[in-house]
From Swiss-Prot:
Top-rank lineage group of the source organism: Bacteria
Assigned keywords, A-Z: Molybdenum, Oxidoreductase
Name of this chain's protein: Carbon monoxide dehydrogenase large chain
EC number: 1.2.5.3
Example of a GO MF term: carbon-monoxide oxygenase activity
Length: 4
Protein backbone atom coordinates (compact mmCIF):
# COMPACT_ATOMS: atom_id res chain seq x y z
CA UNK A 1 0.00 0.00 0.00
CA UNK A 2 3.03 2.26 0.29
CA UNK A 3 3.76 1.57 -3.40
CA UNK A 4 1.53 1.77 -6.48
Amino acid sequence: MGHP
